[in-house]
Structure formats: structure tokens, C-alpha cells
């Protein structure tokens, strides 16, 4: 498992834009699973939507992207310092939002490698709440020098 303090050593994101709390499983160049606890105190709920809080789909995608970024960094064969590199997401295809995500939910991410060639990655991303699919997409990324 990789906790939030270790995630911050891998990814440049910080509160309020670090959208993965823990990595629960990681198989190099294959799959990563992690989650974010969705809280009513998340700043996004001040405006999305008052009286009917729904976690934005674009933030679900970003959380999947960050989870995939951890997998990409941990799968690098040359093990460079992540502080000298950054993962840029270059494309999102086939994004679908199946069910709303609300405060109190645990948002589980699963990112599977579809293809990897050098610094280029294609992931199949899925997000779940209580085992139910809430979002899915194919995400493309590349690791570049800062």
C-alpha cells in the first residue's frame, strides 16, 4: 500500500487538488487500485451543487489520472526522481458517467494498462462506489521532464 504521504513524494499535486488518498494495490506495468474518500468539507461542494452535492465527473477523471500517474512512475525502469518528471495526460476517450458520487462515498479507482511504449501510456480507467461502476474512460498520458 502507498499512503497519502508517499503519494505526495510521487505526484506534484497537493490539497485541494490531490484526489487520491491511498493506493491499495499496484502491479508494475499492469494495474493500480486506489481510492479517495469524498467529504462534504471538500471545497467543490460549496458550488456543486448547494443543497444537492454531487462530486464533479471531471474530478473523478482527474482522480483516475492521478492514480494512473502513480502506476506510470512506479513502473519506470530507470527509477528517476519523480520530482524531475511530470505526467501529462494527453487524451481522454469514451468517458461515461454512470451514477452520481456524493459526500460520504468512498470513490475506488482502478487503472489498467492497455498499452505502454517508452514514456507513453494508455490506461483503461474505472471508478466505483460500493462496487458499482460510476465512471469509466480511456486515458492517455506521457511522462516528461519538468
Curated annotation (Swiss-Prot):
Protein encoded by which gene: fabZ
CDD domains the UniProt entry points to: FabZ (cd01288)
Cellular component annotations (GO), alphabetically ordered: cytoplasm; membrane
Gene Ontology biological-process annotations: fatty acid biosynthetic process; lipid A biosynthetic process
Group of enzyme by EC: lyase
Record's protein name: 3-hydroxyacyl-[acyl-carrier-protein] dehydratase FabZ
Gene3D superfamilies: Hotdog Thioesterase
Function (record text): Involved in unsaturated fatty acids biosynthesis. Catalyzes the dehydration of short chain beta-hydroxyacyl-ACPs and long chain saturated and unsaturated beta-hydroxyacyl-ACPs.
EC number of the protein: 4.2.1.59
Subcellular location: Cytoplasm
Catalytic activity, as annotated: a (3R)-hydroxyacyl-[ACP] = a (2E)-enoyl-[ACP] + H2O
Family affiliation: Belongs to the thioester dehydratase family. FabZ subfamily.
Species classification: Bacteria, Pseudomonadati, Campylobacterota, Epsilonproteobacteria, Campylobacterales
List of catalytic residues: 48
Entry keywords, A to Z: Cytoplasm, Lipid A biosynthesis, Lipid biosynthesis, Lipid metabolism, Lyase
Record keyword Lipid biosynthesis present: yes
Main localization, broad class: cytoplasm
HAMAP family assigned to the protein according to its UniProt record, in alphabetical order: FabZ
Keyword Cytoplasm: yes
MF terms in GO: (3R)-hydroxyacyl-[acyl-carrier-protein] dehydratase activity
Amino acid at each position: 500500500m502507498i499512503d497519502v504521504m508517499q503519494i505526495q513524494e510521487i505526484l506534484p499535486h497537493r490539497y485541494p487538488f490531490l484526489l487520491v488518498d491511498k493506493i491499495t494495490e499496484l502491479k508494475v506495468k499492469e494495474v493500480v487500485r486506489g481510492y479517495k474518500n469524498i467529504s462534504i468539507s471538500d471545497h467543490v461542494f460549496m458550488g456543486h451543487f448547494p443543497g444537492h452535492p454531487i462530486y464533479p465527473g471531471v474530478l473523478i477523471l482527474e482522480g483516475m489520472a492521478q492514480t494512473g500517474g502513480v502506476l506510470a512512475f512506479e513502473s519506470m525502469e530507470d527509477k528517476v526522481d519523480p520530482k524531475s518528471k511530470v505526467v501529462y495526460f494527453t487524451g481522454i476517450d469514451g468517458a461515461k458517467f454512470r451514477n452520481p458520487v456524493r459526500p460520504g462515498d468512498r470513490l475506488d479507482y482502478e487503472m489498467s494498462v492497455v498499452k505502454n511504449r517508452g514514456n507513453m501510456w494508455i490506461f483503461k480507467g474505472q471508478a466505483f462506489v460500493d462496487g458499482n461502476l460510476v465512471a469509466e474512460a480511456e486515458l492517455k498520458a506521457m511522462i516528461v521532464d519538468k
